[in-house]
Amino acid sequence: MRRIAILGVTAPALFLSACAGGGSGGTRAQPASVTPAVIVSPVLISAAAYVAAASSIDLYEMRSAQLALERARDPATKVLAERLLASHQGTSAQLSLAGRRLNLLPSAELDPDHQAMLDALNAASDFDSAYLAQQAIVLQDGLRLHSGFAKSGTSPTLRPVAQNAESVLRDNLEALRRSR
């Protein structure tokens, strides 16, 4: 269940606006610009939903990396693709092993969003730029998924997989930053 808590800032804002009331001859205080803070609690997802999402990310990363090895022009992009291919083969194998223990097999198909991204990448005229832009999106999405599940996942069997994948994706994001 998604819970969003908005921190109360109304009382201080009202107090400040009351203090800003007209006085004799002094400068008027400007109302404070107050932006409420939004805190989003971790979203609890099932083990099955985690396996499905994580396997689609791994599959997208492997397929896009294979495409990059064929189409990329910049040698640094190819080096990044080799790294991402190897690391996601590893995370995919770990996910598959842990998933089997729970009778949850990773999907062999991309989810519709990842399939659309792969199709767009395949059609891109400036492949290297498109590849790097998509990597930034997918790696950040993956990091959020794995980090959230590592902290509050429903499966003790999958939490260590998520913790490892979180570390791998942090390293991959850093490699992406260096390659730009």
Question: Where in this protein do the model-derived segments appear?
Answer:
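His/Met- and acidic-residue-enriched segments that coordinate or traffic transition-metal cofactors
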Residues: R2-G8, C19-R180
